[in-house]
């Protein structure tokens, strides 16, 4: 864990006046048992360009809660409908310094992956990772990634040619700890 994370608490994060976001960690029964839905963001001029992420995004006042934000964004980005999903609960919040975001992840489940409708401006494609792979950590190893601070060596999940790092990897790490 980066040393600056040791000193982060909710009060310290709040003093940075972060943008708030909610993400949906969707689990479904797939070919290899429980799988986690992820998406690839398109390449654009921004901090999270081309990264693997969970469906989710920035809080809007009409959302009222970050859980509602997660559901709204998941519908807008990949077509997941709240009424087709069983809410499981929330994971730990996290702070993303490069983009100054405070993020709350919410876990949902469905017996099968609902039909997805991708918003092309926000999603290049989706992929899923079997929970067994995440839990046995066989796909975790360091990766060199480019950040706004320059190149950095970080722990990452490697799956189907993709490098899953940053906040997404941290959330997957917590999910792994809960299911192991």
Language-model segments: which ranges?
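NUDIX/MutT-family hydrolases
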Residues: 118-154, 158-160
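N-terminal leader/linker segments that precede catalytic domains of diphosphate-processing enzymes
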Residues: 1-53, 58-114, 145, 150-180
